[in-house]
Amino acid sequence: MKEDYRAALKKTLCTWLGTTRLSLELTQDRMAEILLIDVRSYADIDRGISMCSTLTFVLFLVYLCPEPVTLLKEIRARFDIIRNGME
């Protein structure tokens, strides 16, 4: 069950990070710098290979995310689907 939530979160964040980076016309290097992580770590998150840390997620919400509330609602909707499927 926990892995289902993690997979949904990873997929959502991968999409949002990539879309945001492209819309802001930032390189992976610049995104990594803003998020205080190395470029390889960012690239792995961007490709959906790795999950970001809590700090990285909060830095993204605070400094880069164009619609933080929308992102959180999307995560909640995905979590609700998982939760409802298990009841």
Which residue stretches match the model-derived regions?
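A short, Lys/Arg-rich alpha-helix, primarily the initiator
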Residues: 1-23
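DNA major-groove recognition helix of helix-turn-helix/homeodomain DNA-binding modules
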Residues: 53-71
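Short, charged recognition helix plus adjacent turn
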Residues: 69-87
